Each structure stands twice: as C-alpha cells, then as structure tokens.
C-alpha cells in the first residue's frame, strides 16, 4: 500500500473547492493511505472527511525558522510518501518540493503546464478547471472535482437555531477578511431592512459570524447565531447553510460552501476578481458582478432575491 500526500492550505473557500479533487484522488487510489497537510483551523473538519486517512498540521511558520522546517521535513519523510498532490500551488509548497520532499511524483501546476505554456497564462483559467487539468495529467479520473460532496461535513444544529427562530430563514454573510476590504459590500443593513419589510412573515434574517466578527454582527438587525456565546464551528456552519432557504454573501469561504451545496443564493462581486475565475457559481447559486461594489444598489439585489423567493 502506497502513501499519498495532498497539500491544501489557504482559506476556507480554497479548501472547500478542493474537496472534490480530494475525493477523486482517493477513489483513484482506494488501496493507498491518503494524508492531508493543511492548517490547524481545518483539522477538526477534515478529520471527519471520508476521503482522508490522516490529517497533518502545517503551522506555516516563516521559512527562516529552520528548526520548524527540520521537524516538518522529518515528520513528512517518516510517512514514506510515494506521491504528492500539491493543490495549493504556492511559493511555499514549491519550496517544500525542493527542500522537504523532493519526490519524482509531485503533481503541481508546474508539472501540469504544456511545453512552452506560462504559469501566468494557465492561472487565468477558472480554479476548478485548473485543478481538473492537474489531476488528469496525473492519471486521476475526475468525476467530482467540479462539485465537492459536502454532506459528510454537515452537523444538524436545529437544537441551537430553535432558540433563535422557528421560521425558514435567509442567511447573510456580510463579512470578509480585513485584508480584503474590496470584497465587502457596504449596504447589508439597508438590504436587511428591505428583506424584513417584504418577507418578515415568512423568513427570519440570520447571520453566522466567525470568532472575530461577533461584535460586528451584533450591529445588524438580524439573528446572530452562536453556540453558547461562541462562533459556530465549521461543521455547524455547514449545517446552517444546508438548511437556509436563501443566502446572500460577499466573496468569502461560506459562499464557496453555498455553491458546492447548490443552495439558492447570491454572491456579490466587485473588480477584485470574477465569479468565473474563482468557479463560484452553480445552478442555483448565482453572482452579481459590478466594477465597483460601492455602486451596487440594494434594489438590484432585491430584484434577484424576488426571482427566487416570490
């Protein structure tokens, strides 16, 4: 039995998008032991993933921390990996391929490029298309790469939500990383007022903040869902998304979860990137794209909501 390593760091959205690829790798290597190298934030979630046999943590400390790199190298070598699938394709993982695990069977963007093809050109393709090409070049049958199965990650949290509301609900994610303020739409408070005016008898308005977003969430006129005063864990978040009637979000991790669950909803895009490039749309989860989010009116969003909820 061979040991295979998959590397995926990055954000929640990045990891969510990779789960379909991870499933394809596992199903093409059923007799192999599959390990995932990822961030500590995702240990609990991915420890329950049926396509992963072992979750390894990478603290991603600075590369001048030679003691940490030595320990990580020693740990990785101890597993006798025969193949590596680098789904992160970052400068860090390129460094790992040279100095930590110099294996001949290392699948990455660079090993995927056609002769003469530039990585900068390849990176213009949608992320899931790139991932599919990478897996195919490595001999993996790609049946799930473009649609991650997330059912295994869902935890039923109705015992939590019933203390907040009893109706169906519209779930809103008005947050984003402070480093990516250009992704943030500024008019959610107005939108919530308009949603309440139109749907108050049928739908509650719900927010699910992360640990650093709780105080901000309380500024909105909506139910802020917490578990004993703390942010929901990732499995609980998946459960909340699964039961939502409609979802409106910035371009963040939860939006990618919504897309792969094919939930009815909208994701709002400015000029920071495109819905096409990040592969975020599905049959029911659609995008509204504008050059400048500050000019996106709530009336436009409401018109799209009404197409589904009316």
Label each residue range with its predicted role:
Residues 1-12, 172:
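Nucleotide-activated donor-dependent transferases that construct or modify glycoconjugates
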Residues 7-19, 45, 177-186:
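A short, glycine/small-residue-rich beta-strand->loop->alpha-helix junction that serves as a flexible
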Residues 12-27, 41-44, 191:
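Short amphipathic alpha-helix
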Residues 33-66, 110, 222-227:
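Conserved nucleotide-sugar phosphate-binding/catalytic loop shared by glycosyltransferases and other
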Residues 108-109, 227-228, 256-310:
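Nucleotide-sugar donor-binding patch of glycosyltransferase catalytic domains
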Residues 149-216:
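Active-site donor-nucleotide binding/catalytic segment of nucleotide-sugar enzymes
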Residues 189-266, 270:
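Donor-binding and catalytic core of enzymes assembling or modifying cell-surface/extracellular glycoconjugates
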